[in-house]
Amino acid sequence: MEKQLCDYLLVALQVDPTIDRPGIKNKPIQSVYERYVQLQACKYVDEILVYETEYDLLQLIKTQTLHIRFLSEEYMNRDFTGKQYCIDNGIELHYHKRQHNYSSSELRSRTAKLENMKNQEFTSTLPQHSSELAYKMSEK
């Protein structure tokens, strides 16, 4: 959808949002390289710029020739890095709807649940020793 609104799609990829927003954002599960490769595989992405901090992102916004900035609709009524700069400099803000229910928080929750189930299954398959055997083992 975004590519229909622009000629050149530049994607900014943050290394780790917890660097300057700990406790607010989640640490990425995948490495920056893995995420970069996934973006690179998308036929609509023309260029990927990697940045570390929100300050770095603002510098990218200020130094690139941008006409439109795409954000998730969850940012519509929030303040965010570069919002005022975009408004002041005629960079259109386009808020897109999330067409899916995937999120890193939900993925973490599912992964933790499955890992917990796996650990419980493993523990339940361990042989249970009698208290007499446990006592004998402790005497050695």
Annotate each language-model stretch with its function.
Residues 1-140:
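Nucleotidyltransferase catalytic core that binds NTPs
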